[in-house]
Regions:
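Peptidyl-prolyl cis-trans isomerase
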Residues: 56-306
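Short, low-structural-confidence N-terminal segments
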Residues: 1-67, 181, 303-306
């Protein structure tokens, strides 16, 4: 069924480039439709966020775009049940937009608009997408914050133990995947490794990772090693730049980390600041896992055609 849908999308989008594309309904989720145009726009959006996707064949990118827009639509349906309106404060939207265009090495919102225009995208379209993502994260916090287990004392002890002038930071990317049985981990990991060797870590993250970072090639940025738990730190410290970890088993997913770069900062550690960052990192990691659990739960209860 999925292959038939992708073939239909490919024919609808790429065999009609010289003409106006006819709008076709591809999915109907709880009376909310997804058309071939929606999927084409998602295609452009994902490539704008992660240029390396262009290295993949178009059918593969369409598959990623199809799954991505389905996730967005399902999230939007659930948000409409929990919020009066799907809207964010403009100041907060500006912060989120800056995070995006800064990662793309753009210096201003005007540069970002020009960049989006080159992909036939508008700023309002991006605002709508990041609003859904941000409100979804807020919903997950509302539902699961009481279930988070962050040992602040343990984290603080680890930071104090490493309170030295030279502080190490790592530039990391991630893939977080899931399996139904523990014995399937190695098989799935080997499948992902094969993909990484063929199409790169970024593109493999877009295909296999259920983390929100999959849209940006798994990029999680610079992380101080004191913000990481001992298990993750141990795995990273065994890597050379460019290498990635063996599967790291988390409570609700399997993590692969790639070491992009490492740097030493000749500064005294700000204990309170590092504690705050470490707590946020661990909290966000757990929330990301609960996000997947909740998404799977609501998806099962929706009427889904296509």
């Amino acid at each position: 069924m999925k292959k038939k849908i992708l073939l239909l999308l490919f024919l609808l989008i790429y065999n009609n480039q010289a003409y106006s594309i006819e709008t076709k309904i591809i999915h109907n989720i709880q009376n909310e439709i997804i058309t071939n145009i929606d999927i084409k726009n998602e295609f452009k959006y994902l490539i704008a966020l992660n240029n390396s996707l262009q290295e993949l064949d178009k059918e593969k990118i369409l598959g990623i775009s199809n799954e991505s827009i389905i996730r967005e639509k399902i999230k939007k349906i659930e948000l409409s049940k929990n919020f009066k309106e799907i809207k964010l404060n403009e100041d907060y939207i500006d912060i989120l937009l800056k995070n995006i265009y800064s990662r793309l090495n753009l210096k201003s919102i005007n540069e970002f608009e020009m960049y989006l225009n080159s992909y036939d995208l508008t700023l309002n379209e991006i605002k709508a997408k990041i609003t859904i993502d941000a409100l979804w994260n807020e919903l997950i916090i509302q539902k699961y914050s009481s279930k988070l287990t962050v040992d602040k004392d343990k984290i603080k002890k680890e930071i104090l133990k490493n309170n030295k002038i030279q502080s190490k930071e790592h530039l990391l990317s991630e893939i977080i995947f899931e399996v139904t049985k523990r014995e399937e981990i190695e098989k799935k990991y080997n499948e992902i490794v094969k993909s990484i060797n063929q199409i790169g870590f970024k593109n493999s993250a877009a295909i296999y990772s259920f983390s929100d970072t999959s849209k940006i090639g798994g990029d999680i940025g610079w992380i101080n090693e004191n913000s990481l738990n001992n298990n993750i730190k141990k795995n990273i410290n065994s890597l050379k730049v460019g290498e990635f970890t063996k599967p790291i088993i988390l409570s609700n997913g399997i993590l692969i980390l790639k070491l992009i770069n490492t740097k030493n900062s000749e500064t005294t550690i700000d204990i309170e600041n590092e504690l705050k960052k470490a707590i946020n990192y661990e909290r966000n990691r757990q929330l990301n896992q609960y996000s997947k659990i909740y998404y799977n739960k609501i998806k099962k209860n929706l009427d889904f055609d296509g």
